[in-house]
Amino acid sequence: MSTRPVEGSAIWDVLSPHSPHAAAADGKTLVWVEAGELCGHDTAESANLARIRPGLLAAFCHPKATEDDLTLITKWMAWLFLLDDRIDESDLGRDADLLDGHLQDLQGVALGIRTASGPMSRALEEIITQASAGMGDAWQLRFRRNISDYLLACVWQAAHRQAGEFPDPEVFPHWRRAFGAIMPSFDLIERTDGGALPSCVYYSRPYQSLLTAAADLVCWTNDLMTVDKEAAHGDLHNLVLVTEHDRHQDRRTASAAVSAACEQRMRAHTSARRDLTGLTAALGLPDTVRTHADDCAASLLVWVRGHLEWGLETPRYRPGTTGTGTD
């Protein structure tokens, strides 16, 4: 089990409910993975996916989701785990041009300009189609764009690995959110929690601040949990390692700095949520929209806390394990 990060943080005061559909979502997703030949004949890869339980992560992060929506989100998370591991643990993750070519089919599907031609792209096409059902055009375009940004960020990460460079600490948080696939994952909160937010809310300064604060919390607490594993793997794309290198600090001091940054993001989320309440009132939005906006703001922190709970349980974050390895 991973060491509990940010001990004493206000994030531990956030309730962490759990969907009752986790096991069902895991089971249906594993059947889907096999039927779609996402793992081919790689039994170790499919066994690893079963072991890390994407359905449990979905259940922690989306406790209000219906069983169908939770299964959809579990498929999305399983798809991400498979792609991330294939990139990170092969030459793809260290050759930006090779990876860029490899991802063209997925990019075309994400942007709606290409028909899927392989198992992973067909799976992505299905996920996008199912996620888009009942959602408006603006949400659908945003979801596609955010997936495309994630794929582009994987190439950025590969270019830095290829050069053996530590990321610039000033721009790293932006790219960390992107290659963590946080924004398309957060888009799904609107699907499970009542529908797409109007653009005047979603693109407002308060809601964008809420998204950024919550996304940073997911990424940075993840980095605190995984720093030893990633350091052993030679992966520099971890905020603790970036801080350690940039400030010439030891691991403990750098970890403390990242923990302090997490607390700052918690305060930023609290402030932005208060500002969002004021904005939706000033705009004269219907009570249903104002309540939905506040519910989505609260659900962002539930997502952060849910990811933490799963991270403490999953073997995925333990030092000495790989995507297809054993505990």
UniProtKB/Swiss-Prot annotation:
Alphabetical UniProt keywords: Lyase, Magnesium, Metal-binding, Plasmid
The UniProt record lists the keyword Lyase: yes
Top-level class of the enzyme under EC nomenclature: lyase
One Pfam family cited in the UniProt record for this chain: Terpene_syn_C_2
EC number: 4.2.3.97
Highest taxon above the source species: Bacteria
Keyword Metal-binding belongs to the record: yes
Catalytic activity: (2E,6E)-farnesyl diphosphate = (-)-delta-cadinene + diphosphate
UniProt GO MF annotations: metal ion binding; terpene synthase activity
Protein family membership: Belongs to the terpene synthase family.
Protein name as catalogued: (-)-delta-cadinene synthase
